[in-house]
């Protein structure tokens, strides 16, 4: 049995699990950028051929999920990961900084921005291995998430609930 979610399963999950309250996002998808062409982190680092293919699969997977906003850090690899879905949905990718003025990862500003700009939307955030866990935590997830250096296939779905912490689903694509 494959762990790969298909669009029909994802659509059913969204319809069944999404809250109708306008007090929070309907859902937030969070992914790490797809495979990069180099092991270097010095910009600009584009996606590899495998990474470009994964970005296209992500677009195919989320095309019917109701995504109405896409956020990405301002690196080539994250923007290239977001690009196929943004193009398909005719959305402009919104850039965000994953670090505070001290250079350390700070996800709280993005969490506040998502809440204020997209109160009733389904959102996709494309980040990095070191920014995903802090973002999920800033969005209220209680589970501890670790992303390995070679892990590019995680797709997190955070669904707010009327009370208590949000539901966090971890899938692979």
Segments from the language model and where they lie:
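Hydrophobic alpha-helical segments, principally membrane-spanning helices and signal/leader peptides
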Residues: 4-5, 17-18, 75, 113
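Conserved beta-strand position immediately N-terminal to the Walker
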Residues: 123
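Short beta-strand segments
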Residues: 126-128
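Bacterial N-terminal signal peptides that target proteins for export
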Residues: 1-11
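Bacterial N-terminal signal peptides
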Residues: 11-20
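Coiled-coil-like amphipathic alpha-helices with heptad-repeat character
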Residues: 2-3, 21, 27
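Active-site-proximal alpha-helix that buttresses catalytic centers in soluble enzyme cores
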Residues: 25-120, 132-134, 138-173
């Amino acid at each position: 049995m494959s762990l790969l979610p298909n669009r029909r399963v994802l659509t059913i999950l969204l319809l069944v699990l999404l809250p109708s309250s306008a007090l929070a996002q309907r859902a937030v998808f969070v992914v790490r950028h797809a495979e990069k062409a180099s092991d270097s982190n010095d910009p600009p680092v584009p996606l590899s051929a495998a990474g470009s293919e994964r970005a296209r699969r992500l677009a195919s997977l989320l095309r019917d999920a109701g995504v109405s906003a896409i956020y990405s850090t301002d690196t080539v690899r994250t923007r290239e990961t977001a690009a196929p879905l943004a193009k398909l949905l005719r959305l402009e990718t919104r850039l965000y900084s994953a670090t505070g003025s001290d250079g350390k990862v700070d996800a709280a500003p993005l969490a506040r921005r998502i809440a204020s700009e997209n109160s009733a939307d389904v959102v996709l955030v494309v980040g990095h291995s070191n920014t995903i866990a802090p973002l999920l935590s800033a969005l209220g997830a209680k589970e501890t998430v670790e992303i390995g250096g070679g892990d590019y296939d995680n797709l997190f779905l955070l669904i707010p609930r009327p009370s208590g912490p949000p539901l966090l689903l971890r899938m692979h694509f």
